[in-house]
Amino acid sequence: MEHAEHGNSNAPMEYQSETGRLNILGFWIFLGAEIVLFSTLFATFFVLKNRTAGGVLPDELFEVNLVMIMTFLLLISSFTCGIAVHEMRRGSLKGVVIWTIITLLLGAGFVGCEINEFVHYVHEGAALSTSAFWSGFFVLLGTHGTHVTIGIFWITGILIQLKKRGLTPQTSSKIFISSLYWHFLDVVWIFIFTGVYLMGLGGL
């Protein structure tokens, strides 16, 4: 049971403390609850997707270029987040900080685009109360966008800890856990991109 030993130097840094291992396990359980949450929101959206109440239709408002930019920003941020974890395992504090900051900037760009998108839709007459479709749309995407925003603040806090404490098994487990969270949000976005935007643009 070598892997269960406290301070196993052969394991990745984030697994080298018992606390880190337990925190990672606990976070996987938390992600299970998040999967249930988003599955419920997706199911609700698909039930409501044809109930536009004679109002503005998604294919009249969805902008391909903006959606592609948002997708590009979030997927590239997943890649840079992965590089940050790689740099962490190499023991490079500078590399972790640089790639994490890039990830945060990309995430902030995504949130900015989404806010701009929502403002545009409301201006064009598509608001939360316009129809059942738009209610499902704003709740689903708003929940995802809120999660991304929370992630940005959370990871910023981890960066501050890194500056004070450096790379330790404790800070490394936090970096790894935040990367799981970030990758999860990217996966959710792929489903949003496919199930909401592509189907909406296709009039499905």
From Swiss-Prot:
Family matches, as Gene3D superfamilies: Cytochrome c oxidase, subunit III, four-helix bundle (1.20.120.80)
Pfam families xrefs: COX3 (PF00510)
UniProt keyword terms in alphabetical order: Cell membrane, Membrane, Oxidoreductase, Transmembrane, Transmembrane helix
Membrane topology (UniProt): Multi-pass membrane protein
Entry EC number(s): 1.10.3.-
GO cellular component: plasma membrane
PROSITE patterns in the cross-refs: COX3
Reaction equation(s) it catalyzes: 2 a quinol + O2 = 2 a quinone + 2 H2O
Protein's cellular compartments: Cell membrane
Listed transmembrane segments: 27-47, 66-86, 95-115, 118-138, 140-160, 184-204
InterPro entries per the UniProt record, alphabetical: Cyt_c/ubiquinol_Oxase_su3, Cyt_c_oxidase-like_su3, Cyt_c_oxidase_su3-like_sf, Cyt_c_oxidase_su3_a-hlx, QoxC, Ubiquinol_oxase_su3_dom
Example of a GO biological process term: aerobic electron transport chain
Major site of localization recorded for this protein: membrane
GO molecular function: cytochrome-c oxidase activity; oxidoreductase activity, acting on diphenols and related substances as donors, oxygen as acceptor
UniProt function note: Catalyzes quinol oxidation with the concomitant reduction of oxygen to water. Major component for energy conversion during vegetative growth.
Similarity comment: family membership: Belongs to the cytochrome c oxidase subunit 3 family.
Protein name: Quinol oxidase subunit 3
Gene, per the UniProt record: qoxC
